[in-house]
């Protein structure tokens, strides 16, 4: 019993005619007409792919990224919109902006606010003198207003909103010397979409022209080239049409990257498949086979390769659907579906066109196919496999060594033409503002209570200071620092100095009142002198009163004596007296009336005596009181003198105090001015009355939510926020915010961080994970496909391994070209997009080569390698060059990122075609020998069997085909 080997030849086997090949052979014309009908239908009844792309464009924003969630939350809390689409209107003047510019600006703002369909909110800061400085340039020649637009960035509504804003700006006449620009992230995204669509026709024309020239040089037949290009055109039209149908129906979304990549892949892959088909057919014809036999030989030799290649490309691009980033996710289904359609067309239309054309000899070789050069290459490889492998690895090191220096860029502006409107707007902004001014970070904290109080404002200022101290941050605008610096007059030293200022205003009056104390002291001195004089006078008056008492006592005695004598006289004359009172007519008798009057006067002496007695009593009381009264005056004089002394002392003391207060006030004022001038924020404080200020309440609307539960901070970078340094600062900003709130009443507040650097920080992390996911899934899928086709584990592993090595070297060469030679950093999208495509297309040529190894293995391992190299060398090289040039033609796109992706893929294909497929893979196969085909069992040398000419190989076959056996 003999062992069966995989490379044992079956001399009795007849040429196999696969069922599908026979069906295509039989129904070639209907197949051609059917595919043409499909092209007509999708062209006539379905909008173009570019039109569908505009109609069904999807947002490229990763909705589950923290920065985008923060953006949505900030918009909701501050009632500024629910989209991630923002734009800016820049107003630039030749001279500092004046009243005319303000009037023009107010008109624009009014129209923008009136467009509720496209503009969700307008941050009118320049219209308020309190906040105008925050959006005006230092030279006063530019200002801007930020708009929140309807529709998420990249969607049709967002693009429509950008056009609506531009229409308003263009339709509003600007004053002389004033110009307005519409720019910002959404405007840039819309312009990028338009530029990509506009460049698509140019890319296609350049690609077709280059392919036509290259194929004409290869085949030397215009008819062959035209038929091949028509076939490729049908593949492209069908692939684009089917994807357009899916997009138009809403089944899938599209982006400008997906449209560009699908078009280039369909053209390149379709051309490659055509080259494979024609090349294998011409090889069979030159080997002496008839047209039908050559047709079946072609199908057996290329169908599985085309299918495997197409499935590999479709599968690898479909793996992008597993990514989380819409940038990559949106490439997956459109490219995969398009490639499946292209493969279906290539596997049916290609052989059908070949069959029909071969009837008229249109695809027969016009010259002898030279294989000797490639056989010599194969001979060198199998004779010295290790040196060849070392040499190819050394060449690969050129690219691999460039990888550590790889630096990416996230600034989309650098990859768009300067003439697009958004870039013109950014250029105008750059003339007056820093790059960071147009690309701020927005941090918001949300608490469970109203923060409009002095205590929470201390925490908010602490948070602002903590963020400001992060390296790379140039300014932090918040409610405690609306213009990015500490508010004037908010430091405790300055507030103390302001209190002293109030005291200084009253100290003059206090000093005047103190000087009045001197006048009062003088008045008191006068009073003391008066009291002293009064004391002496009252002392004299007391002695006089005492003498008056004695005199009055004597008068009283005299009066009493006089009264007694008058009484005696009255008693003697009483009878006569009675007459005078009894006489009725006494008043008429002079003598009577006179005597009567005398008697009345004598009666008054008695009253006088009584009154003198009373007077004597009063005088005695006065004589008693006057000494006491005189005794009271010296204490008064002494008290007055003491009071005068105290007033003089108080005046002296107050004068010293006032002088000291003036000196202290000068120091406090100087300290307050110093803290204010230095913008020192170490002792920030806002008193409660500030919160009642109308101007401050207006400012709070920009930085605090309506309920006071949320506060936001506008953070500006020192450099470009989209640089690696700016992106790295996001973690530091978040950490600084968390540390600043630690141990404060706002410790449990939620922190949201959005903005340019925050977005690209999330994109950078997401891209790394997506690249890892897509690359691993693609490698696994490619390995499975290779394993199914080759049935050899080691061979499949070698194909995948060499592709991975080629991938690293190819990307390194792209880094070398763009970063070190052209001095342009690669866009961050280039790595992921080119890696996935290179993983897919890079395995094609290795698959074709290894499949040919398997076909020629019956001649022996080494001889099979030589024959395979000779048979596929020119075909694969032509296909690789065409594919590479096709992808490199993307460099004519207005989008430099598309050009970078194309050139990176092109360099990878050149490296894979000229180095990996030509030298590395054959050398590994030669080194491994029969282990290359494990677990298949193969003979190292061919089995000895009698030579029997086959029907498909006439005796006239060139001897060179069998004289190259080396094992």
UniProtKB/Swiss-Prot annotation:
It is a multi-pass membrane protein. One of its GO terms (cellular component) is peptidoglycan-based cell wall. InterPro entries: MMPL_dom (IPR004869), MmpL_fam (IPR004707), Mycobact_MmpL (IPR050545). It is found in: Cell inner membrane. Pfam families: MMPL. Residues 943-967 are annotated as: Disordered. Disruption phenotype: Inactivation increases mouse survival. Induction: Transcriptionally regulated by MmpR5. Repressed by iron and IdeR. Gene3D superfamilies: Multidrug efflux transporter AcrB transmembrane domain. The chain crosses the membrane at residues 26-46, 210-230, 242-262, 303-323, 333-353, 384-404, 769-789, 793-813, 821-841, 875-895, 913-934. Signal peptide: none annotated. It comes from the Bacteria. Belongs to the resistance-nodulation-cell division (RND) (TC 2.A.6) family. MmpL subfamily. NCBIfam families: actII. This is Siderophore exporter MmpL4. The gene is mmpL4.
């Amino acid at each position: 019993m003999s062992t069966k080997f995989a490379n044992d030849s079956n001399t009795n086997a007849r040429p196999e005619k696969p069922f599908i090949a026979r069906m295509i052979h039989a129904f070639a014309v209907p197949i051609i007409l059917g595919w043409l009908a499909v092209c007509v239908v999708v062209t006539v009844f379905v909008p173009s792919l570019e039109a569908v792309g505009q109609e069904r464009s999807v947002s490229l924003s990763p909705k589950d990224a923290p920065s985008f969630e923060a953006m949505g939350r900030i918009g909701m809390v501050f009632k500024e919109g629910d989209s991630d689409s923002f734009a800016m209107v820049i107003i630039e003047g030749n001279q500092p902006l004046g009243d005319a510019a303000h009037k023009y600006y107010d008109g624009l703002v009014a129209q923008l606010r009136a467009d509720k369909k496209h503009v969700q909110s307008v941050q009118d800061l320049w219209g308020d003198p309190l906040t105008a400085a925050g959006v005006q340039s230092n030279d006063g020649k530019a200002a801007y207003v930020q708009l929140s637009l309807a529709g998420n960035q990249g969607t049709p509504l967002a693009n429509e909103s950008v056009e609506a804003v531009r229409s308003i700006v263009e339709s509003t006449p600007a004053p002389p010397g004033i110009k307005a620009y519409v720019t910002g992230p959404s405007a840039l995204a819309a312009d990028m979409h338009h530029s990509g669509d506009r460049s698509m026709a140019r890319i296609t024309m350049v690609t077709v022209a280059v392919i036509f020239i290259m194929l004409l040089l290869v085949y030397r037949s215009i008819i062959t080239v035209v038929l091949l290009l028509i076939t490729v055109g049908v593949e492209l039209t069908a692939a684009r049409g089917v994807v357009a149908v899916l997009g138009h129906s809403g089944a899938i979304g599209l982006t400008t990257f997906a449209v560009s990549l699908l078009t280039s892949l369909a053209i390149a892959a379709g051309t490659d498949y055509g080259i494979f088909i024609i090349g294998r057919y011409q090889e069979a014809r030159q080997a002496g086979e008839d047209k039908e036999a050559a047709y079946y030989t072609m199908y057996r030799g290329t169908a599985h390769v085309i299918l495997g290649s197409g499935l590999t490309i479709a599968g690898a691009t479909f793996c992008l659907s597993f990514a989380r980033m819409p940038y990559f996710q949106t490439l997956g289904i459109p490219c995969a579906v398009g490639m499946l359609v292209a493969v279906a067309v290539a596997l049916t239309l290609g052989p059908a066109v070949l069959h029909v054309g071969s009837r008229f000899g249109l695809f027969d070789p016009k010259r002898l196919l030279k294989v000797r050069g490639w056989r010599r290459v194969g001979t060198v490889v199998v004779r010295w496999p290790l040196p060849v492998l070392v040499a190819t690895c050394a060449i690969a090191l050129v690219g691999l060594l460039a990888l550590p220096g790889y630096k990416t860029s996230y600034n989309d502006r650098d990859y768009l033409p300067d003439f697009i409107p958004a870039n013109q707007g950014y250029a105008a902004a750059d003339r007056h503002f820093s790059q960071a001014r147009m690309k701020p970070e927005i941090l918001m904290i949300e608490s469970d209570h109203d923060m409009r109080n002095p205590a929470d404002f201390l925490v908010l200022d602490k948070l602002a200071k903590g963020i400001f101290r992060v390296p790379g941050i140039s300014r932090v605008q918040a409610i405690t620092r609306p213009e990015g610096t500490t508010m004037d007059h908010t430091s405790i030293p300055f507030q103390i100095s302001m209190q002293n200022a109030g005291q200084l205003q009253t100290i003059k009056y206090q000093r005047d009142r103190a000087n009045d104390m001197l006048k009062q002291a003088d008045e008191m001195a006068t009073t003391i002198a008066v009291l002293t004089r009064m004391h002496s006078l009252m002392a004299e008056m007391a002695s006089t009163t005492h003498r008056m008492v004695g005199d009055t006592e004597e008068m009283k005695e005299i009066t009493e004596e006089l009264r007694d004598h008058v009484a005696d006289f009255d008693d003697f004359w009483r009878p006569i007296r009675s007459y005078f009172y009894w006489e009725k007519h006494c008043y008429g008798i002079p003598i009577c009336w006179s005597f009567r009057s005398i008697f009345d006067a004598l009666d008054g002496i008695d009253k006088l005596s009584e009154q003198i007695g009373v007077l004597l009593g009063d005088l005695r009381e006065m004589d008693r009181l006057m000494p006491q009264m005189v005794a009271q005056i010296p204490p008064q004089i002494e008290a007055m003198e003491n009071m005068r002394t105290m007033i003089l002392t108080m005046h002296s003391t107050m004068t010293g105090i006032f002088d000291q207060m003036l000196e202290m006030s000068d120091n406090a004022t100087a300290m307050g001015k110093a803290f204010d001038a230095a913008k020192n924020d170490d002792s920030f404080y806002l008193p409660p009355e500030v919160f009642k200020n109308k101007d401050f309440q207006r400012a709070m609307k920009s930085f605090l939510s309506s309920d006071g539960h949320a506060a936001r901070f506008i953070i500006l970078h020192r450099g470009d926020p989209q640089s690696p340094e700016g992106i790295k600062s996001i973690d530091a900003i978040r950490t600084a915010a968390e540390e600043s709130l630690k141990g404060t009443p706002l410790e449990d507040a939620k922190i949201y961080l959005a903005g340019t650097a925050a977005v690209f920080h999330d994109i950078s992390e997401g891209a790394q994970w997506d690249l890892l996911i897509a690359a691993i899934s693609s490698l696994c899928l490619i390995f499975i496909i290779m394993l199914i086709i080759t049935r050899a584990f080691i061979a499949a592993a070698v194909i995948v391994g060499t592709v991975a090595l080629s991938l690293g070297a190819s990307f390194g060469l792209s880094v070398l070209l763009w970063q070190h030679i052209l001095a342009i950093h690669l866009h961050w999208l280039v790595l992921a997009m080119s890696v996935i495509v290179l993983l897919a297309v890079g395995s094609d040529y290795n698959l074709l080569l290894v499949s040919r190894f398997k076909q020629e293995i019956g001649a022996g391992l080494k001889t099979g390698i030589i024959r395979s190299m000779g048979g596929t060398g020119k075909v694969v090289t032509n296909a690789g060059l065409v594919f590479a040039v096709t992808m490199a033609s993307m460099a004519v796109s207005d989008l430099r990122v598309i050009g970078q992706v194309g050139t990176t893929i092109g360099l990878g294909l050149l490296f894979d075609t000229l180095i990996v497929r030509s030298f590395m893979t054959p050398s590994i196969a030669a080194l491994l020998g029969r282990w290359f085909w494990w677990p298949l069992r193969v003979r190292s040398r061919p089995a000895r069997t009698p030579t029997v000419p086959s029907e498909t190989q006439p005796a006239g076959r060139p001897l060179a085909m069998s004289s190259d056996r080396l094992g």
